[in-house]
Amino acid sequence: MNKKVIIIGSAWPLRAGGLATFNERLAKQFIQEGFDTSIYTFSLQYPNFLFPGSTQLSNEPAPAHLKIKACINSINPLNWVKVGNELRKLKPDYIVVRFWMPFFGPCLGTILKLVNRNKFTQIICIADNVIPHEKRMGDTLLTKYFFSSIHRFVTMSEKVNQDLKTFTQKPSINIVHPIYDNFGDIISKEEARKHLALPVNEKIILFLSLIHI
């Protein structure tokens, strides 16, 4: 029987972004490696007052060949208990959970505490951030609550790994973020510039960040 992996984090039908794209690609890789894989994502990820956009939902079709269950409500404790008990009884071999901001500490931490009662499932956290970019009162408590249920950690930058060690000495590994291979074939710089109507030989600065006003 194939080992069972459940990924907890953003995925379709939520709007595509870095986390959702990563989780869906990770699920496909687990499937290719022979694991029985599914994703548990959010039925409600952010309350509206925390979400600046017009919609949190994708208008794209569901990813092919992926089992995705949108069932986690980030602000409903009764839902956390329901999902946690469901996963506890399901007894997956591994849960891979994403952590990127303390807001999700109570929700995901409670779910995982219930899962841990089966004394079987290994819980691995991919920590995108440990210390949030915009700090708020209570962040440390929420982060510690979540981390208390994790068995092992994966980080994708040395700085995040260092931040992690200020919270816990549980096993961790730092792995460079993989290059995505699901956005089409790589093209040359010359082709890309022609497509974007940019000068082929000029020096161009590409700015990838946010500007706070």
Region spans (language model):
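N-terminal strand-loop element at the rim of the active site
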Residues: 10-15, 28-89, 160-161, 165
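Charged active-site motifs of nucleotide-sugar-dependent glycosyltransferases
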Residues: 4, 94, 198-205
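Short N-terminal targeting/anchoring amphipathic segment
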Residues: 68-73, 82-106, 121-124
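A short, glycine/small-residue-rich beta-strand->loop->alpha-helix junction that serves as a flexible
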Residues: 10-24, 100-105
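Nucleotide-sugar donor phosphate/pyrophosphate-binding loop at the beta->alpha transition
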Residues: 119-124, 130-149, 158, 187-188
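Conserved small/polar residues in nucleotide/adenosyl-binding loops
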Residues: 211-213
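A short helix/loop element that forms part of the nucleotide-sugar donor recognition site in Leloir-type
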Residues: 184-198
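Donor nucleotide-sugar binding/catalytic pocket of nucleotide-sugar-dependent glycosyltransferases
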Residues: 148-186
